[in-house]
């Protein structure tokens, strides 16, 4: 028996099957120690991302930028965005300011996820040149967000918008 799932549903189906079994082993930004996440943990964070994006008003087929090296948060954003049928636009972690500006404007990106300090700094410098860009969401909690930057938040604060999965019914409908 073959069951076809939308990509966004796969992580949740695997979480039902494997629960607390290890899914990912990773190092935090700049970290030296290895950590792991279970299928259940990743599934829950992906749901929070989907809910948070809906709370920000992200629509079906809207573009969301990810300007980061590979990370757990990158994966969670990909699956979370796909869960509401949004499109993730990947940026090279080494993209120049001109490249970022072009991609943000061309794709009409409102929300740009960034990884580390260098990526945040570049995104902040081009922010005013990108009329559609509303918010920079920073994965690495060690990044220094300027006190003069009301348009940037940490990923952990972004996730609070999806805490308790307030819009999960809508997310589930979008995944059918």
For the regions a protein language model found, what residue spans apply to each?
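A generic secondary-structure micro-motif detector
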Residues: 1, 39, 66-67, 89-90, ...
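Generic anion/oxyanion-binding catalytic loop in active/binding sites
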Residues: 31-38, 70, 89-92, 147, ...
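Structural core segment of the AMP-binding/adenylate-forming
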Residues: 10-11, 55-56, 83-160
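AMP-binding/adenylate-forming domain of the ANL superfamily
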Residues: 1-25, 44-45, 63
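Conserved AMP-binding/adenylate-forming core of the ANL superfamily
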Residues: 24-79, 96-101, 154-160
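Conserved pre-ATP/AMP-binding loop-to-beta segment of ANL
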Residues: 19-22, 153-156, 160-176
